[in-house]
Amino acid sequence: MTMTYQQRFVLDGMAGRAAILNLNARHNRLYSAGDLAGWITTFRHSGATYTRAGELFTDLRKAFDGGDGVRLVTVDHEITVDGVDATQVCVALLFRDNEFQASGTFTDRHIYERGGWYFTSRELEWDLVPRENALPV
């Protein structure tokens, strides 16, 4: 059975979204494990940037501050796929030694190249709320 252009467009978008969710999971696990080399592989081969709280990093090694009891979790992913480009906005939750530390928002750009999805830019803006009010239990 032949698919229409619209059916193929929707299917490709869904496949891209699923792959980007997997990219996020891998990125978070590598960050939490303190695996700098692995974490960097979630970004495009060259030209990727990372911005945290307004500070831009073009050398991703200098941006890395994971591991050492830190756990990064992302939720509420809003992903838009357009061919080989995609954008994402999601919520970041940061835990240290299993205690909630901070929440924020990632705004990401992705590219499909070399058979997979990668971050081209990742911008993290932390929320400006006191720690004890950020995640009521």
Regions found by a protein language model. Name each.
Residues 1-33, 37-42:
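Short, low-complexity N-terminal intrinsically disordered segments enriched in polar/charged residues
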Residues 2-6, 71-80, 125-128, 135:
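C-terminal-biased regions
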Residues 12-15, 67, 98:
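Conserved aromatic-histidine-acidic binding/catalytic patches
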Residues 22, 70-72, 101-103:
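Short solvent-exposed loop/turn micro-motifs enriched in small/polar/acidic residues
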Residues 30-94:
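A solvent-exposed, acidic/Ser-Thr-rich amphipathic alpha-helical stretch
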Residues 81, 99-101, 112:
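Surface-exposed coil/turn segments at beta-strand junctions on protein surfaces, enriched
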Residues 87, 103-137:
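Short beta-strand edge/turn micro-motifs at domain boundaries
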Residues 94-96, 125-126:
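Short, surface-exposed beta-strand-loop junctions and turns on beta-sheet-rich folds
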